[in-house]
């Protein structure tokens, strides 16, 4: 195998791409005694940015409500730039759908907890995610659809 043919997988950068915190019903909602409900949605996306270079993002949406009123809404997207070359497409899809999100996700967890805490609330700690199971579920859903590239995965 020549150097040009050797498989390449390198992290170029991990960064917080987007983050927002909304408290649309503050300060009145803060006086409520009832415990809020918490809804957490996660998504993974991969997109090429150059030849052999991909951006993989993990997005979290955390919404807490008391009855039908929002206490806070956090949306955050953590991204990583990865160089991935000289691999079969199937392996590239697995790397972008499993390995890359596993690298990016701990940063997202920390940023979400920090953002919520800076908003004046107890931190929300996102649980560990089995990205392999998410990827396999996505592949089963896309079977027969002919999609080769990783697309949005939600849980």
UniProtKB/Swiss-Prot annotation:
GO cellular component term of the entry, any = cytoplasm
Subcellular location per the Swiss-Prot or TrEMBL entry: Cytoplasm
Q: Note the coiled coil stretches, chain numbering.
A: none
Q: Which molecular-function annotations from GO does this UniProt entry contain?
A: unfolded protein binding
The cross-references to InterPro entries, in alphabetical order and at most eight, read: SecB, SecB-like_sf
Q: Which UniProt keywords apply?
A: Chaperone, Cytoplasm, Protein transport, Translocation, Transport
Q: Name one Pfam family in it.
A: SecB
Q: Per its UniProt entry, which superkingdom is the organism in?
A: Bacteria
Disulphides: none
GO process terms (BP): protein folding; protein tetramerization; protein transport
- Which Gene3D superfamilies does the record cross-reference, listed alphabetically? SecB-like (3.10.420.10)
Q: Which family does it belong to?
A: Belongs to the SecB family.
Q: How does it assemble?
A: Homotetramer, a dimer of dimers. One homotetramer interacts with 1 SecA dimer.
Describe the task this protein carries out: One of the proteins required for the normal export of preproteins out of the cell cytoplasm. It is a molecular chaperone that binds to a subset of precursor proteins, maintaining them in a translocation-competent state. It also specifically binds to its receptor SecA.
Q: What is this protein called?
A: Protein-export protein SecB
What is the organism field in this record? Albidiferax ferrireducens (strain ATCC BAA-621 / DSM 15236 / T118) (Rhodoferax ferrireducens)
